[in-house]
Amino acid sequence: MTQHLNAVALVVPDYDQAIEYYCGVLGFNLIEDTTLTPQKRWVLIRPRGSNGTSILLAQASNDAERQCIGNQTGGRVFLFLQTDDFDGDYQKYSDNGVNFIETPRNELYGKVCKFRDCFGNSWDLLERSKSV
């Protein structure tokens, strides 16, 4: 039996605002945007060059969901965006106004820097070291 993780849900306040940020600012690809009901869409995005796990943008539909926006992991890093060009992506994201909350650092596992998306979620931008 073979399994893989297809998508991870990310609760957002507005579909179009989220698409604009993740695709416009971070350069992700919009994989699918299908209207299911007048209030609900199936919106999948994925980092450019990736054919792996997608992010399902899930628009908050009640107060409990709205309270979780930007804090789905209780303040911990939620998503780890791996790149093969850390310096290039860091510069591009900085130029695009991404909110980096620390300076890049080298760890045993690679080069990493934490940022917050426009909704407050913590991400790591990461380039793995060749030895790991």
Regions found by a protein language model. Give the residues of each.
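Conserved beta-strand-loop-alpha-helix junction that forms the acyl-donor binding cleft
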Residues: 12-15, 36-38
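Conserved phosphate-binding and hydrolysis motifs of nucleotide-dependent enzymes
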Residues: 14, 117-120
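Conserved active-site tyrosine of GNAT-family acetyltransferases
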Residues: 18-23, 93, 120
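Vicinal oxygen chelate
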Residues: 1-7, 29-82, 88-116, 126-132
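Helix N-cap motif at beta-to-alpha junctions
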Residues: 14-15, 84-86
